[in-house]
Amino acid sequence: MAIRWSELCIVLFALSYAICVLAGKSYYDVLQVPKGASDEQIKRAYRKLALKYHPDKNQGNEEATRKFAEINNAYEVLSDEEKREIYNKYGEEGLKQFSANGGRGGGGGGMNMQDIFSSFFGGGSMEEEEKVVKGDDVIVELEATLEDLYMGGSMKVWREKNVIKPAPGKRKCNCRNEVYHRQIGPGMFQQMTEQVCDKCPNVKYEREGYFVTVDIEKGMKDGEEVSFYEDGEPILDGDPGDLKFRIRTAPHARFRRDGNDLHMNVNITLVEALVGFEKSFKHLDDHEVDISSKGITKPKEVKKFKGEGMPLHYSTKKGNLFVTFEVLFPSSLTDDQKKKIKEVFA
């Protein structure tokens, strides 16, 4: 059953303003668009993200609800020309002052969240976006630390791309076609079509560089992508492609990841293997995990620690931790030691 908007909006509006401020992310980062994004870019980015994180598609998922609140809050500001200008110049504090002085405010104080979504999807129905001609997507392999994938984090990545700039003169484009006839022989004519336009200005490509903040969400797996809509390669008379960061887990000194599970090796002495031991270690977020044993531990024995693996993406659940115990045997024994061991096990 779909979540009721009247109940949902109370929760989302209560969260929406504080979320972006506390997280330290800009509204452009939230919508995954560059600061110079056009109104159409912002609308399309909002549409895609709202479809992805809509509560009806993620029921019971608190993380998706939080993201949906962020997205709506950011869109309310960036879709309003006056609010966006104030935000660009003065940031969050400027929006607060604007609201305090009788302006429409930002962060949940103007539009109704249901109105925002309904303007795109007709009262909440989630239709797929129509296809448009786009430039090439740019895919970047991004190594994320296991710590960031366990707790969530962000990375700043330097990005250079082609940007379309004005240039002198005019250019041929797809605005309109002109049909004319050419004589190719006695009584024979060929109909020709030519793309012409005397209104479109010429353009050129220039390279520009800037930093992109990539959010690493808890539980993301290898191959998952963080997309920045229309921040890929530009194309004349069309929309730019997308910039996509494809996640790869960086090697870790202690853990090996297998989906939602973690694996690690722990060395113990022969005495510890026989009589038991007390051991613990600090996990990726520094909480202590007790792996002690009171019984006999066999070489290569594997013990499972439930809920000590990786968090599942968009879930409060976690995978498991599997610890393989390596028993360190002594390289040699004295005759006296051998005698005592025989006496013990006789």
Swiss-Prot record:
GO molecular function: Hsp70 protein binding; unfolded protein binding
Effect of disrupting the coding gene: No visible phenotype under normal growth conditions, but mutant plants are insensitive to seedling growth inhibition in response to the pathogen-associated molecular pattern (PAMP) elf18. The double mutant erdj3b and p58ipk is male gametophytic lethal.
CDD domains the record matches: DnaJ, DnaJ_C
Induction conditions: By tunicamycin.
Keywords for this protein: Chaperone, Endoplasmic reticulum, Glycoprotein, Signal, Stress response
A Gene Ontology biological process term: pattern recognition receptor signaling pathway
The J domain, residue ranges: 26-91
Protein name per UniProt: DnaJ protein ERDJ3B
Species of origin: Arabidopsis thaliana (Mouse-ear cress)
